[in-house]
A protein has these predicted regions:
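Low-complexity, Ser/Thr/Pro/Gly-rich disordered linker/stalk regions
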Residues: 1-82, 99, 154-156, 172, ...
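Secretory/extracellular carbohydrate-interaction modules
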Residues: 45-138
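Short tryptophan-centered beta-strand motifs in secreted/extracellular beta-sheet-rich domains
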Residues: 68, 160-169, 173-177
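A generic beta-sheet turn/junction motif
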Residues: 74, 168-170, 206
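Short, aromatic/His-centered strand-loop micro-motif at the edge of beta-sheets
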Residues: 137-163
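Short strand-turn-strand beta-turns centered on an Asx-Gly dipeptide
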Residues: 176-184
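Flexible glycan-contacting loops in extracellular carbohydrate-active proteins
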Residues: 186-214
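Exposed low-complexity, polar/acidic, P/S/T/G-rich flexible segments that act as propeptides
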Residues: 210-224
Length: 233
Protein backbone atom coordinates (compact mmCIF):
# COMPACT_ATOMS: atom_id res chain seq x y z
CA UNK A 1 0.00 0.00 0.00
CA UNK A 2 1.55 3.34 -0.99
CA UNK A 3 1.98 6.00 1.66
CA UNK A 4 2.23 9.64 0.64
CA UNK A 5 5.30 11.65 1.60
CA UNK A 6 5.34 15.36 0.78
CA UNK A 7 8.52 17.05 -0.43
CA UNK A 8 9.40 19.51 2.33
CA UNK A 9 12.73 20.96 1.23
CA UNK A 10 15.05 20.64 -1.75
CA UNK A 11 18.36 19.30 -0.41
CA UNK A 12 20.34 18.57 -3.58
CA UNK A 13 19.95 18.93 -7.32
CA UNK A 14 22.01 18.14 -10.39
CA UNK A 15 21.14 19.10 -13.96
CA UNK A 16 24.50 17.74 -15.14
CA UNK A 17 26.20 20.89 -16.37
CA UNK A 18 29.31 18.93 -15.37
CA UNK A 19 30.10 15.61 -13.69
CA UNK A 20 31.81 17.10 -10.63
CA UNK A 21 29.25 15.63 -8.22
CA UNK A 22 29.79 12.05 -9.42
CA UNK A 23 32.37 9.43 -8.53
CA UNK A 24 32.92 6.68 -11.10
CA UNK A 25 34.43 3.31 -10.29
CA UNK A 26 34.43 -0.14 -11.84
CA UNK A 27 34.03 -0.67 -15.58
CA UNK A 28 32.43 1.21 -18.46
CA UNK A 29 32.17 4.96 -18.71
CA UNK A 30 30.14 7.95 -17.68
CA UNK A 31 29.91 11.09 -19.79
CA UNK A 32 27.89 14.26 -20.06
CA UNK A 33 25.16 14.72 -22.65
CA UNK A 34 24.99 18.02 -24.54
CA UNK A 35 21.33 18.52 -23.58
CA UNK A 36 22.12 18.17 -19.88
CA UNK A 37 22.24 14.60 -18.64
CA UNK A 38 24.64 11.87 -17.59
CA UNK A 39 25.16 8.77 -19.73
CA UNK A 40 26.26 5.55 -18.01
CA UNK A 41 27.43 2.66 -20.16
CA UNK A 42 28.54 -0.82 -19.11
CA UNK A 43 29.87 -2.99 -21.93
CA UNK A 44 31.97 -6.11 -22.32
CA UNK A 45 31.13 -7.33 -18.83
CA UNK A 46 28.68 -9.82 -17.34
CA UNK A 47 26.37 -9.91 -14.37
CA UNK A 48 28.27 -10.33 -11.11
CA UNK A 49 31.45 -8.94 -12.68
CA UNK A 50 32.70 -5.35 -12.95
CA UNK A 51 29.89 -2.85 -13.45
CA UNK A 52 29.67 0.83 -14.29
CA UNK A 53 29.32 2.46 -10.88
CA UNK A 54 28.43 6.13 -10.37
CA UNK A 55 27.95 7.55 -6.88
CA UNK A 56 26.56 11.00 -6.02
CA UNK A 57 29.22 12.66 -3.88
CA UNK A 58 27.03 14.46 -1.31
CA UNK A 59 26.19 12.40 1.77
CA UNK A 60 22.41 12.21 2.03
CA UNK A 61 20.42 12.08 5.28
CA UNK A 62 17.60 9.70 6.09
CA UNK A 63 13.96 10.62 5.33
CA UNK A 64 14.40 11.65 1.71
CA UNK A 65 12.86 11.36 -1.73
CA UNK A 66 15.17 11.03 -4.73
CA UNK A 67 13.71 11.93 -8.10
CA UNK A 68 15.22 11.66 -11.56
CA UNK A 69 14.41 10.73 -15.14
CA UNK A 70 16.04 7.83 -16.98
CA UNK A 71 16.13 6.50 -20.53
CA UNK A 72 17.50 2.97 -21.02
CA UNK A 73 18.96 2.41 -24.48
CA UNK A 74 19.95 -1.27 -24.42
CA UNK A 75 18.75 -4.47 -22.78
CA UNK A 76 21.99 -6.34 -22.23
CA UNK A 77 21.86 -5.95 -18.47
CA UNK A 78 20.14 -4.14 -15.62
CA UNK A 79 20.12 -0.95 -13.53
CA UNK A 80 20.59 -0.79 -9.76
CA UNK A 81 20.19 2.15 -7.38
CA UNK A 82 21.93 2.22 -4.00
CA UNK A 83 20.44 4.09 -1.04
CA UNK A 84 22.34 5.04 2.12
CA UNK A 85 25.53 3.23 1.17
CA UNK A 86 28.39 3.74 3.63
CA UNK A 87 30.79 1.78 5.80
CA UNK A 88 29.44 -0.16 8.76
CA UNK A 89 31.60 1.99 11.04
CA UNK A 90 30.44 5.21 9.42
CA UNK A 91 33.11 5.39 6.71
CA UNK A 92 32.35 7.59 3.72
CA UNK A 93 32.16 5.44 0.58
CA UNK A 94 34.33 7.89 -1.38
CA UNK A 95 36.36 10.02 1.04
CA UNK A 96 37.36 7.00 3.12
CA UNK A 97 38.38 4.71 0.26
CA UNK A 98 41.74 4.09 1.91
CA UNK A 99 40.04 2.88 5.11
CA UNK A 100 37.82 0.37 3.30
CA UNK A 101 38.72 -2.87 1.49
CA UNK A 102 39.66 -2.22 -2.16
CA UNK A 103 36.87 -2.35 -4.75
CA UNK A 104 37.06 -3.21 -8.44
CA UNK A 105 33.37 -2.79 -9.26
CA UNK A 106 32.23 -6.41 -8.97
CA UNK A 107 28.81 -6.87 -7.37
CA UNK A 108 30.20 -8.51 -4.24
CA UNK A 109 32.25 -5.39 -3.47
CA UNK A 110 29.01 -3.68 -2.42
CA UNK A 111 27.23 -6.46 -0.49
CA UNK A 112 29.76 -8.98 0.84
CA UNK A 113 30.46 -8.96 4.57
CA UNK A 114 34.19 -8.66 3.87
CA UNK A 115 33.78 -5.20 2.32
CA UNK A 116 32.02 -3.70 5.35
CA UNK A 117 29.36 -1.69 3.51
CA UNK A 118 25.69 -1.25 4.35
CA UNK A 119 22.90 -0.09 2.05
CA UNK A 120 19.59 -0.83 0.46
CA UNK A 121 19.54 -1.42 -3.28
CA UNK A 122 16.84 -1.81 -5.90
CA UNK A 123 17.14 -3.37 -9.37
CA UNK A 124 14.97 -2.46 -12.36
CA UNK A 125 15.03 -2.61 -16.15
CA UNK A 126 16.14 -6.07 -15.15
CA UNK A 127 17.43 -8.00 -18.16
CA UNK A 128 20.13 -10.65 -18.32
CA UNK A 129 23.29 -10.45 -20.41
CA UNK A 130 21.42 -11.85 -23.43
CA UNK A 131 18.54 -9.39 -23.23
CA UNK A 132 15.94 -11.66 -21.58
CA UNK A 133 13.85 -10.13 -18.82
CA UNK A 134 14.45 -11.78 -15.46
CA UNK A 135 10.92 -11.42 -14.12
CA UNK A 136 10.90 -8.93 -11.25
CA UNK A 137 12.30 -5.78 -9.71
CA UNK A 138 13.97 -6.49 -6.35
CA UNK A 139 14.83 -4.64 -3.16
CA UNK A 140 17.79 -5.96 -1.14
CA UNK A 141 19.57 -5.07 2.08
CA UNK A 142 23.33 -5.12 2.52
CA UNK A 143 25.59 -6.54 3.73
CA UNK A 144 24.26 -9.89 2.64
CA UNK A 145 22.23 -9.03 -0.48
CA UNK A 146 19.10 -10.13 1.42
CA UNK A 147 15.85 -9.91 -0.52
CA UNK A 148 13.41 -7.72 1.44
CA UNK A 149 10.92 -6.72 -1.26
CA UNK A 150 10.00 -7.23 -4.89
CA UNK A 151 7.37 -6.44 -7.48
CA UNK A 152 6.73 -6.09 -11.18
CA UNK A 153 9.45 -4.29 -13.10
CA UNK A 154 7.98 -0.91 -14.14
CA UNK A 155 10.82 0.02 -16.54
CA UNK A 156 10.92 -2.49 -19.39
CA UNK A 157 10.77 -0.28 -22.50
CA UNK A 158 13.78 0.93 -24.45
CA UNK A 159 14.09 4.60 -25.41
CA UNK A 160 11.23 5.63 -23.12
CA UNK A 161 11.81 8.40 -20.61
CA UNK A 162 10.71 7.28 -17.15
CA UNK A 163 10.35 9.55 -14.11
CA UNK A 164 11.41 7.74 -10.93
CA UNK A 165 10.82 8.67 -7.30
CA UNK A 166 12.52 6.69 -4.54
CA UNK A 167 11.33 7.42 -1.01
CA UNK A 168 13.34 6.35 2.03
CA UNK A 169 11.92 6.75 5.52
CA UNK A 170 14.21 4.75 7.80
CA UNK A 171 13.40 1.10 6.99
CA UNK A 172 10.43 1.92 4.76
CA UNK A 173 11.19 2.47 1.07
CA UNK A 174 8.95 2.98 -1.95
CA UNK A 175 9.39 3.22 -5.72
CA UNK A 176 7.11 5.34 -7.90
CA UNK A 177 7.40 5.48 -11.69
CA UNK A 178 5.65 8.18 -13.73
CA UNK A 179 3.65 9.10 -10.64
CA UNK A 180 2.39 5.56 -10.03
CA UNK A 181 3.30 3.39 -7.05
CA UNK A 182 5.33 0.37 -8.17
CA UNK A 183 6.31 -1.43 -4.96
CA UNK A 184 8.16 -1.03 -1.68
CA UNK A 185 9.05 -2.71 1.59
CA UNK A 186 9.19 -2.36 5.34
CA UNK A 187 12.35 -3.71 6.95
CA UNK A 188 11.45 -5.37 10.25
CA UNK A 189 14.92 -6.78 10.89
CA UNK A 190 16.53 -4.76 13.66
CA UNK A 191 19.23 -7.30 14.49
CA UNK A 192 21.66 -4.61 13.39
CA UNK A 193 21.03 -0.91 12.71
CA UNK A 194 19.14 -0.34 9.47
CA UNK A 195 20.88 1.61 6.67
CA UNK A 196 20.32 5.27 7.43
CA UNK A 197 22.59 7.87 5.81
CA UNK A 198 25.15 7.69 3.02
CA UNK A 199 25.55 7.93 -0.73
CA UNK A 200 23.08 7.42 -3.56
CA UNK A 201 24.38 5.62 -6.59
CA UNK A 202 23.91 3.70 -9.82
CA UNK A 203 25.19 0.35 -11.01
CA UNK A 204 24.79 -0.70 -14.63
CA UNK A 205 25.88 -4.27 -15.22
CA UNK A 206 25.76 -6.65 -18.17
CA UNK A 207 27.14 -7.31 -21.61
CA UNK A 208 25.85 -3.99 -22.98
CA UNK A 209 23.54 -1.72 -21.00
CA UNK A 210 23.41 2.05 -21.46
CA UNK A 211 21.19 4.60 -19.73
CA UNK A 212 20.85 8.38 -19.62
CA UNK A 213 19.96 10.13 -16.35
CA UNK A 214 18.40 13.59 -16.12
CA UNK A 215 17.17 16.14 -13.57
CA UNK A 216 18.26 14.62 -10.26
CA UNK A 217 16.53 16.07 -7.20
CA UNK A 218 16.76 15.12 -3.53
CA UNK A 219 14.08 16.31 -1.10
CA UNK A 220 13.63 16.06 2.62
CA UNK A 221 10.40 14.25 3.54
CA UNK A 222 8.74 13.93 6.96
CA UNK A 223 9.27 10.77 9.00
CA UNK A 224 6.04 8.80 9.34
CA UNK A 225 5.97 6.57 12.42
CA UNK A 226 2.39 5.55 11.66
CA UNK A 227 3.74 3.31 8.89
CA UNK A 228 4.83 0.77 11.48
CA UNK A 229 1.48 0.83 13.29
CA UNK A 230 -0.53 0.55 10.06
CA UNK A 231 1.40 -2.54 9.06
CA UNK A 232 0.92 -4.17 12.46
CA UNK A 233 -2.88 -3.92 12.27
Amino acid sequence: MPIAYANLELLQRDDFADAAQWHHEGAGEIKLLPEGGLRLHCFGSRQGAEGCMAFFRPTLPDHIAIEYDIIVHSHGGLVINYLAIRGLQGEDLIADLAKLPPRTGIMADYYANRTGLQSYHISFSRFDDDGRHTGTSNWRRNPGCRLIGHGSDPCKELKRRYSLRLVKDAGHCQLFVDGNFAHGFIDWDHARPIPDTGKFGFRLIGSDVMADVFALRVYRVPPNMSVWHICEE
